[in-house]
Amino acid sequence: MDAQFTLELTQLLFQSIAPDTTQITEATRALETKYLKEPGSLLSLFHIMGTCENPQVRQLAAIEARKLCHKYWSSVDADVQNQIRSNLLDITLKEPESIVRHAFGRVIAALAKLDLPEGKWNELSAFLVQATMDQNDSIREMAVYVLYSIAETVDLDNKLLLDFVNLFSQTITDSSRTVRVTSVQGLGAIAEVLESDDKKLLHAYRATLPGMLLVLQDVVQVGDVDASKQVFDVFNTFLIASGAIISKALGNIIEIITGIANSKQVDDEIRCMALSFIISCIRFKSRKLQALKLGKPLVLTLMEVATEETTDDIDEDCPARLALRSIDLLSTHLSPSQVFYPMFEAACAFSQSPQASYRKAALLSIGVAVEGSSESVAGNLPNIFPIIINGLCDNDMDVRQAALLALSQIAVEIPTEVSKHHAQLLPLVFELMSTQGVKVGKSACNCIDALLEGLDKSEISGYLPMLMERLVGLLEFSDTPDIKSCVAAAIGSAAFAAQDDFIPYFERTMASLSQCLHTTDDDEGYELRGTVMDTLGAIANAVGKQAFLPYTEQLIQLAYEGIQIDHSRLRECSFCFYAVLARVYKEEFAPFLEHIVPALFKSIDQDESDILSERIGAPTAEEISQLLDSVETNEEENDEELEKAMGVNSAIAMEKEIAADALGEICMYVGAPFTPYLEPTVEKLVACTTHFYEGVRKSALSSLWRCATTYYKVCNVPQWQPGLPLKVPVPDTVKNIFEAVRKCTFDTLEEEYEKTVATDILRNFAESIKTCGPVVLGDDYEKLCEVVMEVLQKQHIVQAGDVFDDDFEEEDIVSNEEVDDTEQDALLIDSACDVVIALAVALGGSFADSFKVFYPQIVKYYMSKNGNERAMAVACVGEVAGGIESAITPFTRDVFSLFMAALEDSEGEVRSNAAYSMGLLCQFSTEDLSSEYLNILQKLQPFFTQEVFRTALDNAIGCISRLILHNQNAIPVDQVLPIVFSKLPLKEDYLENAPLYHMILALYRQQNPCLVQHLGELIPVFASVLTGSPEQLNDELRSELLSMVKEIAPQYESVVSNYPQLVALLQ
């Protein structure tokens, strides 16, 4: 060892801890560029560790020595190595400062990692085991900490792992709390590498869990926040380690940790740790939780926690806020039977409480649960609305705000159902927006925003004058960017609902919004500007391209400037604005592509790690690794740095999601002029399909399918015909793009673990097949059928079980039959049925052989207790009948029996779908079912006298129309038609207009007396469908119906004259 070098190195280490920034910078540079690059620096550092009197320098020397061990230890002479090993153990035992002892312990572990595999330092284990039994607490603590460091650092075989488990199982009961906690950490390190195939090791490990729980309860009871965090970190490790470790103990673990979360005697910071564990448990062990039927006790406990006060800072964790987050996740990951229904029962009781905190918790629980249980919420709206209305009228401000938040969330998730109650809800919310303080007023404005978006043009018209006067007034006179943002968003929703009825308010609104585009250069200003860009897009869509044209170029330039600003939210809103303008201007948007598409590419190309270092001055990837390894440094600061890193990554990921989605939208609406950008767009999007964030994957895949479908359309391929091989030639370029999209789609599906992504993939596949026909399938028809069958059998990887639980013992496996489906599960299966339907449409009669395989799997869902699944099964079989047409004949008797039973189902949606499907079966099957028509009519009769389901009446009319078209002689037309005509026009399911008006046209050509005598009273119906929304009729049917009306118009001139729009059409 060079004495002079060691002296200089010591001086530099002293300089590194000086209070002078300049000295620190100079010392760090010298250490990195010169001194620590010398092989002899390791020996000098060991010397400084043992001799320096300053504990900070000793600690720093140990940190640097640990980093250098793997570089220089092998070059040290064997005799010197032995001397260092002995001396290192000695100085570690004698070190008085615990943080320095830990640093020394890490050095011992680093050397052990190098020595033990080579059969060196064999005496270390015996020394440490002996030290764990020493009378001196500090020696035991040191020994266990070194053992923990070795367990964390060294690759141990199963025999050594078992020795460590057995040793920690003894030290976990030590009289020293520090020893006990460190023992738990050591066991946590072992859990990360433990594999379940060694049963002896697994059972020994499981035997330590009760002891670990006792340590957790102890540190929680004494309020030791740091120790609690260390132990909770270990329990969090269990959730992503071998599933077999805690599978048998999970119920007991949840019970204890839930108790901690719910105890007001426990420090809030520790309770937040417990709730964070519950959140992770829901994410990673949802099927196990469901199999253990823990959903109900969990949600009830969490609702109790939700009654507590929340902190003012919405970004700050507190027990109540985390409890609501947990309820949100529970509703998504567990079935409604275990979460929503127990939660709603408790919410009903809470809402009657004299304590405002309970009434507030009831409303907030309903609000957070709706995203994962929207179908269940929709089915219970008659019982939910009274709770919300009472909340809106509550005398407590916090309860009123909670009611607004709940109503907003429900309106976002199920807008159609909520919009039916606008007359009851909107006046209450208007009043709160006008008369309450800023806090409630802001929530009321957000609620208005959500409610308006669900209204149609006719529903909003009565509110528009008063609403726009109030909103524009608030926008012009409020000084608060936050309030302005809420108001601007509400204006956007009003425009979205009003469509061209918004034109009278257009100029004043644009003038007011324009002022908000020149805001302060801070987060609030950028947020406001982003929201205004969203609103301007909604207005452009409402008023149309001609009215918006004077503003277009300037706003596109402003949006482009927004993209250059370092603010993800503003960039996202600019991307959305471009996508909306593409929808409005279509091919006329082409001149702007040369600037906009590269900007979208730039966003997608962002490297999260580069941006991380650039934006927050964060360390490099290697330095982050060192931060994670260096537990002897300030862990709290490290956590903050990593949180900042994750925050930046999340913001960039969400920006990429929006950019990917905007590319697909722009491609779809601009069409042919986008073709020069198509190839690089596909390349960028394909790269995004492997992104870590599911939102990016989903947007990228959706946009890829839109790009492929759009290219098919712009190539003007003749209308496809059902069947494979292709009957209509398709250019190779079209085949190639579909092949590329299919490949990354199947690659993603092979390892996708997010149900929402898998669901979206199958929906896009189905839509593309229906639009573009069999060319979409290429050579992958069998592969697609395999994926769909896996999903229908609940055997796809995304349905296979909890994340990380691929190595349970056989008795621990949770089968799909043991748990009810979540609504997310049901959506995935529904999307698989969509693909089956699409294949039937694209392949026609040739799909019949495949349908023989699919049919039993689909019909199994009709046996489900879940009404939605029964409805799905009936609709799927009916749609397939419509796709394969006469090829349904061999299935007729089975399918007919299914539909007849479904027409009497307890659920209205099932009966509605059965009516639709029965019509298709009777229309296309070549087996004569006319003898059953009267039985079918009998089962349809209640549809005309009762409220069965939203679409039930329309489906019944469609069914009857098909029966008449197929064999009118089997129907008492003179009795049936007056009833059908009295219920027109159709209001809910416009698809049924096709059989209805084909039937009317057919009877008219025959001059059927029953039809002819009702033609006069049908004029208002014809006026409604011919002058109403275009989606009511396809072009061909519209033309035929218009011709018929022109023929009969002279006979009914006095009636026709009451409908000016119809008169204009007839001229």
Swiss-Prot record:
Required for nuclear protein import, its predominant substrate seems to be ribosomal proteins. Binds to nucleoporins and the GTP-bound form of gsp1 (Ran). Transmembrane segments: none annotated. The gene is kap123. Gene3D superfamilies: Leucine-rich Repeat Variant (1.25.10.10). It is found in: Cytoplasm; Nucleus; Nucleus envelope. This is Probable importin subunit beta-4. One of its GO terms (cellular component) is cytoplasm. Signal peptide: none annotated. Keywords: Cytoplasm, Nucleus, Protein transport, Repeat, Transport. The keyword Lyase does not apply. HEAT repeats lie at residues 159-196, 379-416, 420-457, 591-633, 890-927, 1013-1050. Its main location: cytoplasm. It comes from Schizosaccharomyces pombe (strain 972 / ATCC 24843). Residues 27-94 form the Importin N-terminal domain. It comes from the Eukaryota. Pfam families: HEAT_EZ (PF13513), IBN_N (PF03810). GO terms for biological process: protein import into nucleus.
